[in-house]
Swiss-Prot record:
This is Uncharacterized kinase-like protein D1044.1. Keywords: Kinase, Transferase. Pfam families: DUF1679. One of its GO terms (molecular function) is kinase activity. The lineage of its organism: Eukaryota, Metazoa, Ecdysozoa, Nematoda, Chromadorea. It comes from Caenorhabditis elegans. SUPFAM superfamilies: Protein kinase-like (PK-like). Belongs to the choline/ethanolamine kinase family. SMART domains: CHK (SM00587).
Length: 376
């Protein structure tokens, strides 16, 4: 990222619209986040200090700004599909802006999300972007490898349980029409399958034919079929993050607790097991996942049912939901794993790790991929 996008200063002016000439009233630094692991969007940190005490109470800082411009990682991993990816990014941007707008007045106890300062989708393309609370210096994120430790997995499942319970509680207030999963249409699922097939070429000894064998999991009508299966199980629909991997959870430096869930670009309605499957399959070793799935599901359910005099579904229904939706959720997860494998193999995309560490991470991603394929 060599230059600051034109829209960023305009977003700053919109955030500080109650102040005349904010770039004169405040000292404002715009920092491109060149090493951001954001796959889709271009990201910035905004630092603001007042020029005088008279405006100190107007300061909001630091601020995280994300704009719908294809990131360097996306461009490097998928150089041949820039136009197609930009159209996807339009959809993702609109969905995240909608989420922050719809839920801005609701407190999700136990499921923290950043405070939103600004949101505009591509209906107003010149001003499109999102600005949120920035936690720099207070938080850390973890890598796909090693992934979540025991304490983190339990915290994540508790947080999801609290979130799902709240969503069910306020279900009548939610504009569900805004959360149709329009992204996962037939064309998008075909694209996921075709791109994931490249994983076979990258690792022919381990994966030759393996992605092709599970083509059935890349169900082009998977969203509707998942909802039908969910209804047959007698389960409620909830709001799903749909991209709940390690990079989208921020952890407090001092307490080790969850500080915030971020990046709601893929958010939609869906079964309660969708995000649970992603956490366990993307964030854990194969051995850990297989040995502890039932225990982790039970931990989620214990927290979830504590919100109700009579829970809206049983533990057996939750287990069946996990099994029922495992294949479709992991079809989209395989796509993510293939891109992280490419990233770890490319020194220019993982600047923090040495060659040996990058190779170790790539091999662990491959092991998780094989484990998922074996279980589909």
């Amino acid at each position: 990222m060599s230059e600051i996008a034109e829209v960023v200063p305009k977003i700053i002016e919109a955030i500080f619209s109650s102040v005349q000439e904010p770039f004169k009233t405040f000292n404002i630094t715009i920092k491109p986040l060149e090493n951001s692991r954001s796959f889709w969007s271009e990201c910035y940190q905004i630092l603001v200090t007042p020029n005088s005490e008279a405006h100190a109470d107007k300061v909001v800082s630091p601020i995280f700004v994300k704009i719908p411009r294809i990131s360097a990682i996306n461009a490097a991993c998928d150089p041949d599909n820039a136009d197609e990816n930009m159209e996807i990014l339009r959809t993702l941007t609109a969905q995240e802006v909608t989420f922050y707008s719809d839920f801005s007045g609701i407190q999700f106890s136990g499921f923290p999300i950043p405070r939103s300062y600004y949101g505009e989708n591509l209906g107003n393309e010149k001003m499109a972007g999102l600005a949120c609370e920035d936690y720099s210096g207070k938080v850390y994120s973890i890598d796909f490898v090693p992934g979540f430790d025991e304490s983190q997995v339990l915290q994540l499942l508790e947080a999801l349980a609290h979130f799902h319970a709240k969503i069910i509680e306020i279900s009548d207030e939610i504009p569900w029409k805004n959360y149709e999963n329009v992204l996962y249409d037939a064309a998008y699922i075909r694209m996921l399958h075709n791109d994931t097939l490249d994983f076979e070429k990258l690792c022919p000894a381990e994966l030759s034919g393996r992605i092709q064998e599970v083509k059935h999991a890349f169900d082009e009508d998977g969203v509707r079929n998942s909802e039908k299966k969910n209804e047959k199980l007698g389960m409620p629909l909830v709001i799903c993050h749909n991209d709940l991997n390690a990079s989208n959870v921020l952890w407090n430096n001092e307490t080790g607790k969850i500080q915030a869930f971020i990046d709601f670009q893929h958010v939609s309605k869906g079964p309660v097991s969708f995000d649970i499957i992603r956490i366990l399959c993307l964030g854990l070793s194969v051995e850990n996942r297989r040995a502890n799935t039932q225990r982790y599901l039970n931990h989620y359910y214990t927290t979830f049912k504590s919100h109700f005099s009579t829970a809206p579904f049983t533990f057996s229904q939750l287990e069946e939901s996990y099994r029922t939706h495992f294949n479709f959720v992991n079809a989209t997860s395989l796509f993510s794993l293939s891109y992280y494998y490419k990233m770890y193999k490319d020194e220019s995309l993982d600047l923090k790790s040495g060659a040996d560490e990058r190779e170790h991470k790539a091999q662990e991603i491959l092991r998780r991929t094989i484990g998922i394929l074996d279980d589909m």
